[in-house]
Amino acid sequence: LDGLPMNTTYNNGMEWEMVPVEKIARIEVVRGAGSSLYGGRAVGAVVNIITKDNPEKKGASVNAVVSYGSNNTWKKALYADARVNKKLSFGVGYENRKSDGFKGYYYTGSASKDTGTIKPDKELPQLSSGKYILGGRGEKVWENENISANIKYDFDEDRSLKYTFIHTESEYRYQNPWTTIYKDGKPVFSGSVDVGNGQIVKPSIGTYLGYDGRKESDLHTLSYNDNKNKT
């Protein structure tokens, strides 16, 4: 982001939640050996997301965005930027993104020879591999909050010093576990299920259970730019 690494030190993954989407000016892709200028994790290529700069002329601007999508997906954002004088400018921003999610995971099981104790109301759906679809964890509900601020001091037309702070909070959980197995109209999540031909599947209730997650991240950057002495 603006030439600075966004990968985590834990697993080298990308902190996408920290990217202030409404502030993106352009995206650059650096391929080949030149990407090594960005550090040891940048071998092969670099994707550099460039954000919009603060206004050049004295004054202030405010940008608000509200959008809605499928699965009750919302995005709300508010950004304000201002230039105090010829040398000093700053910006603040807030983004909230959340969704009720969708059923993106399903649990399958292979049949084995045995006598089942549960005779389902109807045949279970089956994949071409022969495995049976037994259900899933349900929808993955998530919410991200992103707060950002920056202050920039221009020494002259070529040299500037900029401090940027980004704070992100992310939460997710699974809800409404579902099953394809019903007995007398009631959902079945465990047991020995008769699928016919002397075969059974044995779903386990633990497989249907999702998990909760929460993550907080802070990013502080101090960058000095000297256009006059670039090489």
Predicted stretch roles:
Residues M14-P20, R41-V65, W74-Y79:
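N-terminal periplasmic accessory domains that precede
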Residues R26, R31, V46, S61-N63, ...:
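Membrane-embedded beta-strand positions in outer-membrane beta-barrel channels/transporters
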Residues Y107-G116, T168, P177-G198:
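Flexible, surface-exposed loop regions and adjacent strand-edge segments
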Residues K57-N63, S89, S160, T231:
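Outer-membrane beta-barrel architecture
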Residues Y68, N72-S99, Y107-Q175, R214-L219, ...:
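Transmembrane beta-barrel wall of Gram-negative outer-membrane proteins
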Residues M14, Y38, V65-Y68, L134-E139, ...:
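Outer-membrane beta-barrel domain signature
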Residues L4-R31:
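Short acidic/polar hinge/loop motifs at secondary-structure boundaries
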Residues V29-V30, A60-N63, S128-G135, S190-G191, ...:
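Extracytoplasmic loops and strand-loop junctions of Gram-negative outer membrane beta-barrel proteins
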